[in-house]
Swiss-Prot record:
Belongs to the phosphopentomutase family. This is Phosphopentomutase. Isomerase that catalyzes the conversion of deoxy-ribose 1-phosphate (dRib-1-P) and ribose 1-phosphate (Rib-1-P) to deoxy-ribose 5-phosphate (dRib-5-P) and ribose 5-phosphate (Rib-5-P), respectively. One of its GO terms (molecular function) is phosphopentomutase activity. One of its GO terms (biological process) is nucleotide metabolic process. The keyword Isomerase applies. NCBIfam families: deoB, PRK05362.1. It is found in: Cytoplasm.
Length: 395
């Protein structure tokens, strides 16, 4: 079965239970979906995700999300092989480029040579410089930053360098320029950092600071060809929605839409679905992760899932017989877990087309590259053998 349009949708950080190697990351027992369901005590209403097998893919159903008796969809899990548990690792691996060598992390903050260069280039002092939750460090240092014009620099358990500044104090163009310079400092060989993230915020004081949608990711350039490049080279249209474009530094992408929020992202999806094209639309919805996972907010996480599920109903209704929808995640971020970092989890895999005559289990797929291999197979494009297509299993 071949499809004219393939929609790959990443529910950022919506993990499906601890991966077998979770202990190496200190993430034993993490289960984003399971724990959010438990937190909602049976009131997590996800009828559309349930219909296409969200609880079917689990050993234990999500509380409030019934197992579908006869899902005309395929379901399973994917297991990562990349060395990290960041968005970059997950998305690159999906597109045939697993990150086998661990990137640089900074549990004690960034070394003096990086900080000095940032200060010299920007003419501004760096404050913070430690692993911290973004909301917490902005609440703590944001008022000082407004008075002094300093740069709030921080990291996490992932390979990221984040720079926060108030939009009224440091204009976005200047913040982005500083982040571009920071990107140039950590492209190897000594330091190899996955993402530089501009984290602008607004608000009058610590009680009212909010990070804005003007966040930008300056990602390490892909270290090799990805499935997006292969599709583009073969003349297959590639559309990116959300931070997907940033994650691949624009490589292999023909058209990109920036998201203000999950709902804005779904507006873009609705729009793209009205277009007549042959190709792949790769979507990332980041609010689950950025707004609720890192902030350890299970209430917000569950509500975001329910809001997404409602919008998914429209997508399912608008699909053509020759459309394929594949829903997954890039890692976990259990909002009930300790700390504020991503969690090493398996991720859901839900595959649907109105043309399916049946449904069933796709099992546990590893690596994530099976996802991209299936897209390539659909369009008759050769891959690099990192993943194995499951297209032939879809009937």
């Amino acid at each position: 079965m071949k499809f004219k349009r393939v929609f790959g949708l990443v529910m950022d950080s919506v993990g499906a239970g601890a991966a077998p190697d979770a202990n190496k990351f200190g993430d034993e027992g993490a289960d984003t979906l399971g724990h959010v369901g438990h937190h909602f005590a049976g009131k997590l209403a996800l009828p559309n995700l349930a219909k296409i097998g969200l609880s079917n893919l689990r050993e234990t159903p999500i509380e409030g999300v019934p197992v579908a008796d006869d899902p005309h969809a395929y379901y399973g899990k994917m297991r990562e092989i990349s060395a990290g548990k960041d968005s970059m690792d997950g998305h690159w691996e999906m597109m045939g480029l697993p990150v086998r060598k661990a990137l640089s992390t900074f549990p004690n903050g960034f070394p003096a040579d990086i900080i000095t260069k940032l200060e010299t280039f920007s003419g501004r002092k760096v404050i913070g410089n430690r692993p911290e939750s973004g909301t917490k460090i902005i609440a703590e240092l944001g008022e000082q930053q407004m008075k002094t014009g300093d740069l709030i620099v921080y990291t996490s358990g992932d390979s990221v360098l984040q720079i926060a500044a108030h939009e009224d104090v440091i204009p976005l163009a200047e913040l982005y320029k500083i982040c571009e310079y920071a990107r140039s400092l950590v492209n190897g060989p000594e330091y190899l950092v996955g993402r530089i993230i501009a984290r602008p915020y607004v608000g009058p004081d610590a009680d009212h600071f909010t990070r804005t949608a003007n966040r930008r990711d300056f990602t390490l350039e892909p270290t090799g060809e990805t499935d997006l490049d292969r599709l583009q080279a073969a003349g297959v249209r590639v559309v990116a929605v959300g931070k997907t474009n940033d994650i691949f530094s624009g490589h292999g992408i023909d058209e990109a839409y920036h998201n203000e929020s999950n709902m804005d992202g779904m507006d873009h999806v609705d729009h793209v679905m009205t277009e007549d094209f042959t190709g792949f639309c790769f979507i990332n919805l980041v609010d689950f992760d950025a707004m609720y996972g890192h902030r350890r907010n299970p209430d917000g996480f569950g509500q975001a899932l329910m809001d997404f599920d409602q919008r998914l109903g429209t997508v399912l209704a608008n699909m053509h017989d020759d459309d394929l929808l594949m829903i997954t995640a890039d890692h976990g971020n259990d909002p009930t877990y300790t700390g504020t970092d991503h969690t090493r989890e398996q991720v859901p895999l839900l595959v649907y087309s109105p043309s399916f005559k049946q449904g069933g289990s796709l099992g546990v797929r590893s690596p994530f590259a099976d996802f991209g291999a299936t897209v390539l197979d659909n369009f008759g494009v050769a891959g690099n053998h990192e993943g194995h297509s499951f297209l032939a299993e879809l009937k």
